[in-house]
Structures are given as C-alpha cells and as structure tokens.
C-alpha cells in the first residue's frame, strides 16, 4: 500500500462548529491511521478513488471517547499470500502468490523494493526491480543489489 506523500487519505468531520473543513488523516503502510481529537461525534469519510481497493465512497459515524478504534472495510482487487524473501550473496529474491478478488481487475504495477530501514515504498528505497505483464498466481522476482 502506498504509505508516503499522502497516498491514502481519509477525512474526519465534526458538525456543529464554525469550521467545517475536514481533518485529513493518512493511512500507514499497514492500513492503520490515527488522529488526536476531542471527544464527540465525528464522520469519517472515504475519499474518491483513493486506495488499492474497489472504489466505495462511504461515511462512517464514530463516537470518539478517549482511545477509540474504528474499522474501514474495503474490498481489495488482489491479495498476496505465501510471501518469501531471501538473500543469497547480493541477490534478493521474492516469491508470492497473488489471488484475484475482483474478476475484471488488472495488475497495473508490481515491484520489489529494498531499503536500509523497515520503511520502504516506491519513494523510499535504495533499489527496485519492476515487473511487467503480471498475472495472478505464483510470482517470482529477483534483484541484484
């Protein structure tokens, strides 16, 4: 999931106040998000075409009281399982199984990214290998670092 540069955004609204601008919250790479808020009722609104899942504009009503959790349910186009990454000398190899969830979905891009930190994405990496013509099923990729 895109995790930097505001890749995935949600918007919080609290009615009853003069300022009706949204409070933008950003999802992290693992899909979590957080915000420091006053107690009270909020509307959590998904943005249009803003994620690697079936587009579904939604409003979730959340009553914030102390530490509050809410879940935003989505339908992914694909899921990935059986991930395995190995390093042999300078060769990083990755294998995974891609399962198609939405029948007419196409994989637009896939890549193997390497970083010196635990945080890695297409903007924060030291090496990358792009894949093209990707289909569901077992996928293998390697990169000489």
Segments (PLM) and residue ranges:
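Structured interaction patches on ligand/partner-binding surfaces of diverse proteins
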Residues: 49-77
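Recognizes extended acidic, P/S/T-rich segments that occur
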Residues: 20-22, 113-144
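Short edge beta-strand/loop segments characteristic of extracellular beta-sandwich folds
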Residues: 93-101
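Short, ordered, surface-exposed loop/turn motifs in non-cytosolic proteins
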Residues: 2-18, 105-111
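A short, solvent-exposed beta-strand micro-motif common in secreted/extracellular proteins
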Residues: 31, 37-55
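A short, amphipathic beta-strand motif
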Residues: 1-2, 31, 94
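Short strand-edge motifs at loop-to-beta-strand transitions and within beta-strands
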Residues: 31-35, 68-70, 137-143
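Short, acidic Ser/Thr/Gly-rich low-complexity loop/linker segments typical of extracellular
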Residues: 15-30
């Amino acid at each position: 999931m895109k995790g930097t540069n505001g890749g995935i955004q949600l918007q919080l609204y609290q009615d009853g106040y003069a300022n009706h601008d949204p409070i933008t919250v950003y999802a992290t790479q693992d899909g979590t998000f957080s915000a420091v808020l006053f107690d009270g009722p909020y509307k959590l609104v998904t943005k249009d075409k803003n994620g690697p899942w079936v587009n579904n504009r939604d409003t979730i009503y959340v009553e914030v009281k102390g530490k509050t959790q809410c879940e935003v349910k989505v339908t992914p186009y694909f899921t990935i399982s059986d991930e395995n990454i190995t390093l042999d000398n300078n060769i990083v190899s990755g294998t995974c199984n891609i399962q198609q969830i939405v029948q007419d979905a196409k994989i637009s891009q896939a890549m193997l990214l390497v970083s010196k930190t635990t945080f890695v994405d297409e903007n924060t990496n030291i090496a990358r290998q792009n894949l093209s013509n990707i289909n569901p099923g077992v996928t293998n990729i390697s990169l000489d670092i």
